[in-house]
Structures are given as C-alpha cells and as structure tokens.
Regions:
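C-terminal beta-strand-rich structural cap/linker in extracellular carbohydrate-active enzymes
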Residues: 658-673
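Polysaccharide-binding surfaces and accessory modules of carbohydrate-active proteins
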Residues: 1, 6, 107, 111-226, ...
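Active-site-adjacent "subsite" loops/lids of carbohydrate-active enzymes
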Residues: 293, 297-298, 339, 344, ...
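Active-site-proximal substrate-binding groove within the catalytic cores of carbohydrate-active enzymes
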Residues: 457, 462-650, 666
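Catalytic domains of carbohydrate-active enzymes, especially glycoside hydrolases
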Residues: 299-323, 419-420
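Active-site neighborhood of glycoside hydrolase catalytic domains
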Residues: 401-491, 513
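Beta-strand-rich recognition/accessory modules
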Residues: 17, 22-26, 31-61, 92, ...
Length: 673
C-alpha cells in the first residue's frame, strides 16, 4: 500500500538481540525478551526502565531466564512491510512462559498480545529418559509495569472517567473535567481504562485495551495503579492477582491441564504525527451548532455568502440539519439540491464545505428496518442506546462500527465526496469508544461464570479512520472531529483537526466562577502533545458565559474558539483572524505560559505568546495576557524577557503599554516590539 502523508514507511534495525522500529517522530525498541525497552518521542526517552512482567509463582517471586545468548529464545522479526512490523518474543521462569507478539503500525500504534502458559517438558522428559521435577503450577500474581520518567509524565487523561483512589485513603472525585489533569503527587489507582495517556505538554505515552478480558485484579476499583518511585512514575497493570479462573485443575497437573491465557492491549507514543507549524488550518464558521437557526440552511445562507467571505471565513461547517435524514448517506432530492447549492456558492468564493455526520442510525432512514438489528450498539441488557430527537421529527440510535456499518459509512463518505465535491467531513463523536455488548456482530465476551461483558472497538475505529483518511486525503479534504471529554489517540493520526471543550461549557454556562483549570486544559486541549490542531467549542449564555471569555481561555493555550453565529461571534473572530493572519505564525516560536519567562505582577494573570525575529534580529511578539479568574484585575503589569518596550491592543486598535486592566476571564491580544 501507499503510506499516506505525512507518515513514512517503517524501518527496523536489529542489533544485540534488540530491534528498533522507526516511526515518524518516534522510535520503539523491543528487547531480547520481547518487551519494549525504549520508547522515544521527538528524540526524548519516555521510559525510565524497560517494560517488565512482575510475577509471583507458588508464593515466590518469578525469576526470568534472561540469558538469551544461551537459551536460544531471543526475540525476532516475524514479518516486516512498509506499513507493519511484527516482533515475537518469549520469557520463561521456573514454572511459566510468556510469549509476546508486538505489532507496530506506520501510525505508531503498538498492539501487544501476551500469552501466559505453564512451562512444558523437554523431549527427554516426555520420553522418560530425564527426570521431570514435580511442580505446582500455581500463579499468585502477574503484573505488567511500564516505568516512565516522572518528568515526562506530569499530566494524564483517562477514559472512561472515574474517581481516582489516592494512597492517603482519599479520592479524587469524578466530575465533568476529572478525566484529565495533573498526575497526583501521591500513588493513585483506578478501575480498568480503555484509554490512558500519561505525558506532558509536548509528548506522552498512551496505553489502550478493548476490554479487561482475562484480568483478575484483587480490587477491580484498583486494577490500574500509578506508583511513584523516585524519578519514576510506574504504570502498573494488575492483570492477575490470583490463579487464572480458567485453570481449575490441580496445580500439580497444570503442565497439560492449563491452557494459555491471553491479554491484549497496546501503547502509542504521542504526538502521533508532526504538529503543524501553522496550527490555524482554517477560519471556520459552524452554522446551527449551539446557536440554532430556523429554517433550511439553503435559505438561511442565501445572500450571505459574500458576508462570510468578507469576514474571513474559509471553511463552512454544516451542522446536522443540512440532511433531512440524520447521518444517512443517500440524500433526499431536497437535501441533494441544498448541498449542491451551498457547495457551489461557497466554492465560487474559495470557501470549503464540511457537512455533519454523527454516530447514529435514524428511524427516518429507508433502510432502518433492514439495518437496525445488524448495526445497533446495545447495553448489557440488550437495549439500544441513544434516541436523539430532531426535526424533521425522528429519533436517532447509536450504531457500533464493529459491524457492517463500518463499510456502509466508508462507502457513503466516498460517494458523497465524489458526487457533491464536499471538502471533507465534520464528524460528531464518531471516535468515541463506546462499550458494546452485542456478540452478534463480534463485540462483548463471556467470563468463565457465563457473565456477559462489553468491549470497546478501538481497533475497528482506528482501521475505519485509516481508510477514511485515505479517502478524504486523496481528494484534498479535511477530517474534522468533535470529541466530548475523551482523547482517542488511536484515531488522531487520521484527523486534521479536533474540536474540544463541550464538557467545560456545561459548568461555565451555568455560571461556574472557579479559576480556569489549567492542568485540565494542558492535558486535554492543547493538541500539540497529541499531534493534531484543536479548536475550542464556545456556547454563549450571556452574561454568565461569553464568547470573549471562551476566547481568553483558549488563546492562552494556543487555540482559538470556533464561531457559531453569523453576527457577534463571527464578527469578533473575523477581527481575531485578521490579527493572526497578519503575524508570521509559521515562522514564529510558540512560548506558552508554562515554559516562558514572561511575568505578570498579579497571581491570576498568565501570559503566552508567539515570538518572531525579524530580519534585523529584533523580536516581535503576539502575546496573550489572560485573567484566569472570574474577578476583574484592575491593574496588572506584564514583562517579557525579550527587549520590548511598547504594546498595542490588537482588537481595540490602541496602544496600552504593558500595564492595563482585565475583566474576569478576559484577555488582551498584544503586539509587542
């Protein structure tokens, strides 16, 4: 296959029983035992020590045979191609074997299978010409530990959201923004997670698993632990805290009675691809999202295309009502006419068009009766989920892409791009890893007691987005995705821009006056530590929460909010776009508040900026001074390490110097030189 840009064909080097696989921006080294011993992102090592298996057998710590020059069990490359390299490895203790299969994809995703089994007998022992030591195959513990450099893992994100149990007996409570933030200063534990990312503002390591099949933690609420050990932060996965439930025979007979137990998971270093030097990839206007409009879009937009152009819009995003039948690919006569008209009018003015598609099947779809049972996502009771209501009157129910709907979706996207010449697609939460229990299309699994458990189709979503990326990228298009409170780093390689922030809106729209949670913002909304640019969602509820306040919160972190109303928010962002367009962002260095030496003499003010050096060697700054609190700051003086002496407030168009006031949750956009 042809590797899509910006990715590169995989390369592998083998030396001293180790194999280093080079992925764009990252390097993974698999050791002689099949375990990852080095993970580098942007040239920086993430691991403090090799990944290890910690086991206790028959009451004693396991000791693994590490003498690979003599034991003839060193890891090897099973297969290699431009898009995937597979490395197999093995570990053996006195009683047990762990075989591993590590698959590294060109996007940097590393799928790992571990197979645990009793140690076998030699040929001589089988034929009775050598003694076979009597042995009890009892396994008391099997943990996987990933030792990270503590300085490389200061932030975290987890999905699904939950409380964190802390070492002092307290809990970090669950809330709308508790899924991300600063890694606790003390040891912490959590239930099983499908996605867990540990990193900082520049890079990190994601861990993932579609289910906890075969896991037996002593306490399910503490299946995963974050353990501090000096300069290390150890990610501990408690795979087994007791003998596997499927091993029911007497341990003395385990050599043949116990069958292999498999654990499936993976890791992915971030950023997943190079972050663009110009992260503001378009000036997007999103119609009918949050700020709802009456009538059909063809009528709402009539006579306004020139206005969009004049205000700097380069991308028009159509929300769900563009399509009479929610998310369906076969368009009605009116919908086809509407889309053709909007695309034609926009293209005349150099504006791209991205229509909405979501994650549901509508009762209005002519194929509802044919597809509903085949593609529905079901809960543990077998019931469909969802039921979104919209006009024309219909209900929309959640689909599972680990079904025939994957192919249906991809074929539909390809045909729409070719027939209507759309410039990509806006996808609402399609990357969300939903817990599905439908064994009819391959989700879910039964434990030894016959209980049904759900699974997350992470690999299916990655595969689907990989193919969608090929479809859209080859036609010069863009994939724009809305995500709500989660970071699916498996799909981010195939996304051009993410739209985050809806969960934060719930609190702000109701009048929340807490200081901006900077740790949360840096963990989840930056984009730079993941590899794809971000825009910020802003739903106004004046006077409690305004678009200006959303601008302040986001611009401090190098991202911009997306306007969703043709008057005020768009008029404001039109001015912001002009400011950003006039500054040489692509030739500038991003200097965020958490690393720069800019100072403010008020504790609630933070400063980030872009620094450009002109041909004479003089610095020019596009700076953002932000009040992170709800209370006004009457007077603050800011300073920069660069020799700048004057500052102009770019939205007001006047010189303000380096001393000024700031309303609650407000910002000054300054040009300083």
């Amino acid at each position: 296959m042809k590797i899509p840009q910006p990715f590169l064909p995989l390369r592998a080097e083998s030396q001293n029983y180790e194999h280093t696989i080079h992925v764009i921006g990252r390097d993974y080294t698999v050791g002689a035992d099949g375990m990852l011993r080095s993970i580098r992102s942007q040239g920086v090592e993430l691991l403090a020590a090799p990944v290890r298996i910690v086991a206790v057998e028959d009451g004693e710590p396991s000791h693994w045979d590490e003498n690979y020059p003599e034991n003839e069990a060193e890891s090897f490359i099973q297969r290699r191609s431009d898009e995937e390299i597979i490395v197999c490895g093995a570990k053996q203790s006195e009683r047990f074997i762990v075989d591993s299969c590590t698959r590294i994809g060109y996007d940097g995703g590393v799928d790992i299978d571990l197979k645990l089994m009793p140690r076998g007998r030699t040929v001589a022992q089988v034929f009775g010409v050598a003694d076979a030591k009597p042995m009890r195959f009892r396994l008391d513990r099997l943990w996987l530990e990933i030792p990270l450099r503590a300085e490389a893992a200061t932030l975290f994100h987890m999905f699904p959201n939950s409380v964190l149990s802390l070492a002092d007996g307290t809990e970090r409570p669950m809330g709308t923004m508790s899924a991300s933030g600063a890694v606790p200063a003390q040891d912490a534990a959590m239930p099983f997670k499908a996605l867990l990312w540990l990193g900082n503002e520049e890079r990190g390591l994601g861990w993932y698993a579609e289910s906890d099949r075969s896991w037996q933690p002593e306490d399910p609420e503490k299946a995963i632990e974050l353990v501090r050990d000096g300069e290390q932060l150890i990610l501990r996965l408690r795979l087994l805290d007791s003998q596997p439930e499927t091993w029911t025979a007497d341990p003395a007979d385990g050599v043949y009675a116990y069958h292999p137990v498999t654990f499936c998971f993976g890791v992915q270093a971030t950023p997943v691809k190079p972050f663009p030097q110009q992260p503001y990839i378009h000036n997007a206007f999103h119609i009918d999202c949050g700020a709802k409009v009456k009538g059909n879009y063809i009528d709402v937009l009539a006579g306004r295309y020139d206005e969009l152009k004049e205000k700097g819009v380069t991308t028009l995003i159509l929300h769900e009502k563009w399509n009479k039948c929610q998310n369906w690919f076969e368009l009605s006569e009116f919908t086809a006419h509407q889309l053709h008209t909007i695309v034609d009018e926009c293209h005349k003015r150099g504006i791209k068009v991205l229509p909405y598609f979501g994650y549901e099947l509508s009762t209005m779809a002519p194929q509802w009766s044919e597809w509903q049972d085949k593609v529905k996502m079901v809960d543990e009771k077998g019931a469909m989920e969802g039921g979104w209501w919209r006009v024309p009157f219909q209900r929309d129910y959640v689909v599972c892409y680990h079904s025939e709907y994957e192919a249906l979706f991809l074929n539909g996207m390809e045909k729409l791009m070719d027939e209507f010449h759309i410039d990509g697609v806006y996808l609402d939460s399609i990357t969300f890893p939903r817990l599905c229990y439908s064994t009819e299309h391959g989700c879910g699994w039964y434990d030894p007691q016959g209980r049904l458990h759900g699974s997350y189709c992470l690999k299916t979503l990655r595969r689907m987005f990989r193919r969608l990326y090929e479809i859209v990228q080859s036609r010069g298009g863009e994939i724009n995705v809305h995500s709500f409170g989660y970071l699916n780093f498996l799909t981010i390689p195939y996304i051009h821009q993410n739209w985050y922030g809806e969960n934060l809106q719930f609190d702000r729209m109701k009048g929340d006056t807490e200081d901006l949670d900077l740790d949360y913002f840096r963990a989840e909304y930056l984009g730079r530590n993941m590899g794809a640019p971000v825009e910020f969602i802003a739903y106004e509820n004046r006077p409690l929460w305004t678009f200006e306040q959303a601008l302040a919160c986001s611009v401090l972190h190098g991202i911009l909010p997306r306007p969703n109303e043709i008057h005020h928010p768009l008029e404001l962002m039109s001015r912001v776009w002009k400011v950003f367009g006039a500054f040489p962002i692509e030739q500038s260095e991003w200097m965020p508040y958490w690393t720069n030496n800019a100072r403010a003499d008020h504790e609630k003010v933070r400063i980030s900026y872009y620094r450009y050096t002109d041909l004479s060697g003089a610095p020019q700054l596009l700076a953002f001074a932000v009040n992170i609190s709800a209370k006004p700051v009457e007077k603050v003086t800011v300073s920069f390490p660069e020799p700048v002496v004057q500052a102009r407030e770019m939205l007001e168009g006047r010189d303000v110097g380096l001393t000024f006031g700031l309303d609650g949750y407000s910002c000054r956009i300054l040009f300083a030189k």
